[in-house]
Amino acid sequence: MLKNSLSWLESYRFNVTLSAQKTLVLIMNYAIEFHDAKYPFLEVAARKKALKHSLLSVVEGLAVIKLGKQEYAIEPGQYFWIPQGCLSSLTFLPNSRVYRCDFSVRLNDDFSQQAGFVKPSPLLKALVEKLATTAERSDLQTDLLTVVRHEVLTLSPKLAHSTLTKTINQWTPGCDMDISKELCLVLTLREARKMKLSGKKKEQIVDTLFAGNTEEYEQLCFLVFGEAL
């Protein structure tokens, strides 16, 4: 009888261990998440505090993050760290693709509280690229994210002003700058959106930014935003 009791106890312990492991995997899946986001049109997010720590990697296109009064261009191949609680707004230009790893505040790791560009290790870059082709909620994704979690703890974020960053910060509607027509168009339409949100009427926006050409304004809105403003 004692032997049977011991066997039952060992079986119980084994099942409890498996259950705990499965629970841990489930927690990890929700505490660390990977997203492969594609933006066919201009996407302008409202300014808000980050609820999670996030690592952004621009694959295609361009992302622009505003911290305080300064904007920073995140170009293809660059990585940017956004700590939890960071007040920022993000703009994703049309046809952009961005990888993002989110880390919940429930994790007790010592994540950097400084926002900025980071230089990923070869391992971290390989992990992020592998995650883009890995099934969501799979055991492999959980394993990869666990290693990513440890890798990001070694990052040292720093803010830097690239030539493109300086250009975007100096840009004003109608100014004569060395800037691509595509970027100038996107910034102009972003300004139009800002004016509308501040209560400006359509006629005033068209007169200020599009020389009174309403038809051109409406066509460009559908082209860049995918809808009318």
What are these regions (language model features)?
Residues M1-L62:
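Generic protein-terminus/edge-of-domain signal
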Residues L6, L18-S19, E218-L229:
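…primarily DNA-binding HTH/wHTH and HhH modules…
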Residues S54, E60-K66, Y79-F80, S88:
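Short beta-strand segments in beta-sandwich/barrel cores
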Residues K69-W81:
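Short acidic-glycine-tyrosine-enriched beta hairpin
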Residues C86-F117:
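Ligand-binding loop in jelly-roll beta-barrel domains
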Residues P120-D176:
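An amphipathic alpha-helical interaction segment
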Residues L164-K200, F222, G226-E227:
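A short, Lys/Arg-enriched amphipathic alpha-helix from helix-turn-helix/homeodomain DNA-binding modules
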Residues K202-L209:
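Short alpha-helical "recognition helix" segments of helix-turn-helix
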